[in-house]
Amino acid sequence: MLNIKWIRENQELFDEKLSQRFIEPMSSKIAMLDREKRKITSLIQEFQHARKVKSKILGNMVSKSGEEFEELQRDVNHINEKLEELEQTLDNNNELNELLNMLPNIPDEEVPYGIDESMNKLVRSYGNTNKNALNKQHFELGTKLNLMDFEQTAKISGSRFVTLKGDLAKLERALINFMVDIHTKEFDFFEISPPLLVRDSAMYNAGQLPKFSEESFITTNGYRLIPTAEVSLVNIVADTIIQREKLPMRYVAYTTCFRSEAGSSGRDTRGMIRLHQFGKVELVSITTPEESKNEHEYITNASETILKKLDLPYRVMLLCTGDMGFAAKKTYDIEVWLPGQNQYREIASCSNCGDFQARRMKARYKEFGSNETTLVHTLNASGLPIGRTIVAILENYQNNDGSITIPDVLINYMGGLKKITTYSE
């Protein structure tokens, strides 16, 4: 959620930043609603003070009868009625909060202006995209190996699901262990095994609700299936005050994730690129406003390191204002090279959310010996999605005979296996 005080004091700049996100100016409407809310709040405080004064006088009166006592009692009753009326008005006047809840984060000054992904800015690239001239797509390779099943899986679950078998299932498990090991041992992330079912309040805190309600699955008793472990991880610090010396707090988790893919009809209908259910290693950092810029580079480097160790060609793109996620103030997308598609595809998103999520979930920190609190900054990164990493390995490590060479760094995780070949049932 955005800072209403900042909006109040920077109305022109606020509208300018909204325009970069292709949203109409809203400062005038927000300022009007804010004035109304503050006026009601001020009246409530005045009546509460008057009630306190009169109630104290009533309590100190020797005689609990007589005209003066009864008049004061009537005054207190009248104040209570007015307070109830004003508090009800305040509760019913949700327009300001509803408006603020639908507004995305303000872009950082370093974020380039742009309409869509075509205007993102190249930051750096790694690896040789021409090292393998073979160009079969992952679903062709996986199906031919008899280790990737879409047809039978569709009978079980419908479209956008896959079953991995044999050595591809083993590769999935190897990648999970490899990624978590790198993040915990080399980058000092603390491993978490979080819940996959969360309340709406947790989704709201992470910026998933109310705007993206249709993009998640909801159970019959009202729980949401997490679209990313970011939801569970950032909420670890919800409604807490953290001692400054404990920051940064870095978390890593592998979870299954679930997305309805609403609005993705017709996109990536074949293969493993866009599934309803997929595994992902997620990184989350909690830090101070002063350190969040450096932490953004740190968490992005952690994601890049996985691709470097796997020797997969990739590039890092700074997203423009029109392509950033809702809660992010600045985002790097890491795109891996896929020979089968002859293009780069997103494999990781690394975002600095500033205090946007922290304001929603009341996550703060304070210096030792101080009572003053400050909102933390939250950051997240994919580190990485397992399915898309398998896609990249299949396409970049394919051989003429249809077999797949195991990247050197994964051989021990695969029990010494160096090549994936056709499985015969």
From Swiss-Prot:
SUPFAM superfamilies, sorted: Class II aaRS and biotin synthetases (SSF55681), tRNA-binding arm (SSF46589)
Catalytic activity, as annotated: tRNA(Ser) + L-serine + ATP = L-seryl-tRNA(Ser) + AMP + diphosphate + H(+); tRNA(Sec) + L-serine + ATP = L-seryl-tRNA(Sec) + AMP + diphosphate + H(+)
EC number of the protein: 6.1.1.11
Pathway membership: Aminoacyl-tRNA biosynthesis; selenocysteinyl-tRNA(Sec) biosynthesis; L-seryl-tRNA(Sec) from L-serine and tRNA(Sec): step 1/1
GO biological process terms, semicolon-separated: selenocysteine biosynthetic process; seryl-tRNA aminoacylation
Keywords: Aminoacyl-tRNA synthetase, ATP-binding, Cytoplasm, Ligase, Nucleotide-binding, Protein biosynthesis
Any GO CC annotation of this UniProt entry: cytoplasm
Family in the record: Belongs to the class-II aminoacyl-tRNA synthetase family. Type-1 seryl-tRNA synthetase subfamily.
Function summary: Catalyzes the attachment of serine to tRNA(Ser). Is also able to aminoacylate tRNA(Sec) with serine, to form the misacylated tRNA L-seryl-tRNA(Sec), which will be further converted into selenocysteinyl-tRNA(Sec).
Domain notes: Consists of two distinct domains, a catalytic core and a N-terminal extension that is involved in tRNA binding.
Subunit architecture: Homodimer. The tRNA molecule binds across the dimer.
Designated name of the protein: Serine--tRNA ligase
